[in-house]
Amino acid sequence: MEIFLGILIPFIGTTLGVACVLFMKKTLRKQVQRALAGFAAGVMVAASIWSLLIPAIEQSENMGALSFFPAVVGFWIGVLFLLTLDHLIPHLHVGSEQSEGSKSKLGRTTMMVLAVTLHNIPEGMAVGVMYAGFLAGNTQITAASALALSLGIAIQNFPEGAIISLPLRAEGESKGKAFLGGVLSGVVELVGAVLTIIAAQLIIPALPYLLSFAAGAMLYVVVEELIPEMSQGENSNIGTVFFAVGFSLMMVLDVALG
């Protein structure tokens, strides 16, 4: 039950954020979008460092001076994995007119949902690999530290859910369809978490690689999508300030609960 709730919490965060479309106006002010993107980026960077990369290095201490090796290898595999998906899957970022990925005849709203779905894959994997480490009896990953990551991801999923559902509504979708599209984009987190737990149980020695893999994938999303989004236009410093807020919050959660 503890693990089930842990992997469900981020999805709940997404769903609550998506629900904003049911009672808010169709669009968010640009300053609000930048603030939300900055906050999400801060949480993801802190989670990648404190919850994923540092534990990956600590679990490889038996390798001595080469303890960094699993973290570096896993990190790069994660980056390349997301880079590959980014090129293969047609998607459209919120606020952009130009689609990315392979050429497709998919509609704008479908490609917007796919963009957020891509974003959610590494988040689900990150939560899954933490709970996999806890299940494996890894002394450096506790139920509290896994919960801290789950809560952090859920907190940043709330504004993320609003960021996707409101533009879908602005594109002409009904409130119901905009809500459903946002929720579906979050389902991939549940799937990613479950599959990662299963994979990690089968190859427990690979846990440091899986931790850093999730970190690499998350940081790819931050640099490729969130940092540009939080830095565009006037008053871009609001994105930087909220990045610091998100980073601090995730760091506090990890240290206080972990």
Which residues make up each language-model segment?
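Intrinsically disordered, metal-sensing/regulatory segments
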Residues: 1-258
